């Protein structure tokens, strides 16, 4: 009898614990109709919230969810991951492909303003902007007892996040689903796609309607990404013919951690030539955030805006989450355990998922030449050969389509992220997501 009572009590306690967790989930999502700095009510549907990850839900991942402005019942659902690792997804929302942007006014001590954009991907898709890994943006841990984030570990956490998010938003469970991101998320997105794909064939959880993924200037493999900086720099007239020929002859195409002393000297010469160049987009001036006439001044304005007490209140930020918000926390504890994401791309292709891989063609960090090289290494036949894609009568970039449902495209004049050419990138994405040729 005592054992029976004990068993019943345990069951009741477990039930109460589950009810408590469900209640926490319900309370953690909020509809946001007004944002400080934006005049009037928001012209789109915004939800913010936290999803608990792990057995004890010790990790709390923060997200911004914006419904498609076209037909949310049928339009695709995209998960957006910013790079870093450690860069808040606000980087995507306010700089790259969201419906709001910072107004570039000189900061005068008052709250910076927000303005609507004309290039939001939410015009045709619903989007979840996720702060990950833990410690990024407004995502935090309730305790110190959690696994240190890693590339492969994040793929599992993101998959868990999606399962829980979709269980709360079942009206989107049948929508075509895509994972998207840029920069360092090139290591995490392909692994996440594979993790979701595997999960769809396992028991106990409803399948996610995974259709494919989108990556911009993705970090893929350090040696490939770095080695192609030298030919890219030469093509952009950043180094001389003589230095380029010497580098090729002496280093034989391997420029990462050279052991040959002559090669090392030449690589150092290359570094001197490119030190004063803006790595993210070589045609922009190298400048500091605090300069009002500089493009990245918006990063400073965003920091002032996000750290305003009324903005945090509107976004329903848990007070226990973090102290000062930073756009990119580059010192985040993290294990880089995926050395190359190429095998993940291969597996995802074999499983039939669509992909759009695009490159701003003026990025020195991850040159388009590097991305082209690993795409070429997949050895798929070409369906649509290299050609310009147009916006009205202007060239938006160049594109090539492969038999594995992979489309590669450049964005002419673009940089390391979509923020440098947001309208052109939007046109490219809009066509691809709707199944149209670029």
Swiss-Prot record:
Principal place of residence: secreted
Enzyme Commission code(s) on record: 3.4.16.-
Any one Pfam family match given in the protein's UniProt record, by short name: Peptidase_S10
Lineage: superkingdom: Eukaryota
InterPro entries on file: AB_hydrolase_fold, Peptidase_S10
Role according to the record: Probable carboxypeptidase.
Protein name: Serine carboxypeptidase-like 5
Organism from which the protein derives: Arabidopsis thaliana (Mouse-ear cress)
Taxonomic path: Eukaryota, Viridiplantae, Streptophyta, Embryophyta, Tracheophyta
